[in-house]
């Protein structure tokens, strides 16, 4: 499995990630549920090279692009970050959620040396919540985003 930093992506790869993100199947689970323009997406990626608090990675397995994992709010002082993921909605590979989650956890804990992983997930996204529970995430709180209930979960190293 290969993790490719968004700042190192080719234009074609950047557009693949945008196409996934703008698909109805993916954007319905995002806080910002509107379609993102190509210019906005490319500008966002250009700004990532200057950020120490966030990192986006395209995940490739056996020459197939399978998804994106991202870390935001990276705090090396507190040894924690928030993470998210989305998969290629046009190629429904079996077990892709597990694969992306494992990749993100290993990357953050083993390579970045962080100790705590946090995430927020819409409470109606039961498939994702069940996946997180299988990885021993613990619900720590709830909040409302876009008038929808969101569960906040954590995983300690």
Model regions: which residues?
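Conserved N-terminal entry element of GNAT/NAT acetyltransferase domains
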Residues: 1-12, 157
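Hydrophobic alpha-helical core bundles mediating ligand binding, dimerization, or RNAP-core interactions
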Residues: 17-22, 41, 45
């Amino acid at each position: 499995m290969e993790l490719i930093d968004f700042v190192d992506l080719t234009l074609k790869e950047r557009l693949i990630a945008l196409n996934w993100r703008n698909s109805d199947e993916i954007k319905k689970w995002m806080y910002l549920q509107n379609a993102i323009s190509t210019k906005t997406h490319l500008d966002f990626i250009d700004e990532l090279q200057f950020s120490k608090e966030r990192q986006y990675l395209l995940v490739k397995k056996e020459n197939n692009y399978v998804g994106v994992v991202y870390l935001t709010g990276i705090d090396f002082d507190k040894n924690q970050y928030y993470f998210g993921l989305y998969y290629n909605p046009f190629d429904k590979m079996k077990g892709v959620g597990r694969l992306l989650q494992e990749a993100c956890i290993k990357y953050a804990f083993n390579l970045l040396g962080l100790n705590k992983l946090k995430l927020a997930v819409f409470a109606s996204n039961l498939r994702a919540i069940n996946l997180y529970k299988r990885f021993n995430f613990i619900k720590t709180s709830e909040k409302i985003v876009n008038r929808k209930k969101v569960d906040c979960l954590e995983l300690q190293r």
